[in-house]
């Protein structure tokens, strides 16, 4: 696959940009960040308006820890194609890294409007509300999440924990027990259920 993509490097700028974008992504997945960055640069230089190339460039910059610069690449990708969900998702993650929680939430809420049943987006929104110390909103978004992935034991145990923190032991028991049914090896869940039964 790499050899085939490398053949396209000699083509016109759009084809070269697409090939370099794919090569950058492949190297990124293989954790060869230097090569990924080189091909991301080639992709962006070949076609500055390619949102996938800009997103890949943002990913390589993000992986090197320069979150502000990564955010700029993601924003540029979105200016070129406002429907680039990868750039919007990664911009939200970048804002979370930068502790710009309100901006991260805004990104994920926009994504939710586009991708209504995306488990990843719902989980990010719930997590942000948890970071904002708003357990009621976190619970509401986790409830939407379990309508998409009803057997996820980690989401169920997270709901149990939030209800427990809110003092609702019966709901906490329900979600911890559901979590236990799907993943009976989680020690934290077993300990909570044991303590609940002793009380």
Predicted regions and their residues:
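Structural marker of alpha-solenoid helical repeat scaffolds
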Residues: 11-12, 46, 80, 114-115, ...
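Register position in tetratricopeptide repeats
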Residues: 29, 63-64, 97, 131, ...
């Amino acid at each position: 696959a790499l050899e085939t993509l490398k053949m396209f490097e000699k083509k016109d700028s759009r084809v070269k940009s697409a090939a370099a974008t794919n090569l950058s992504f492949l190297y990124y997945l293989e954790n060869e960040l230097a090569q990924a960055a080189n091909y991301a640069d080639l992709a962006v230089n070949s076609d500055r308006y390619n949102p996938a190339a800009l997103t890949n460039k943002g990913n390589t910059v993000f992986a090197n820890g320069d979150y502000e610069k990564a955010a700029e690449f993601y924003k540029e990708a979105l200016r070129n194609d406002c429907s680039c969900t990868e750039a919007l998702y990664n911009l939200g993650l970048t804002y979370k890294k930068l502790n710009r929680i309100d901006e991260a939430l805004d990104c994920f809420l926009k994504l939710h409007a586009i991708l209504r049943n995306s488990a990843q987006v719902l989980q990010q929104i719930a997590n942000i509300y948890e970071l904002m110390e708003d357990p009621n909103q976190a619970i509401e978004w986790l409830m939407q999440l379990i309508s998409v992935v009803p057997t996820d034991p980690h989401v169920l145990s997270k709901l149990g924990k939030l209800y427990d923190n809110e003092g609702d032991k019966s709901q906490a028991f329900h979600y911890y027990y559901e979590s236990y049914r799907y993943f009976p090896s989680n020690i934290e869940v077993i300990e909570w259920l044991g303590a609940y039964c002793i009380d």
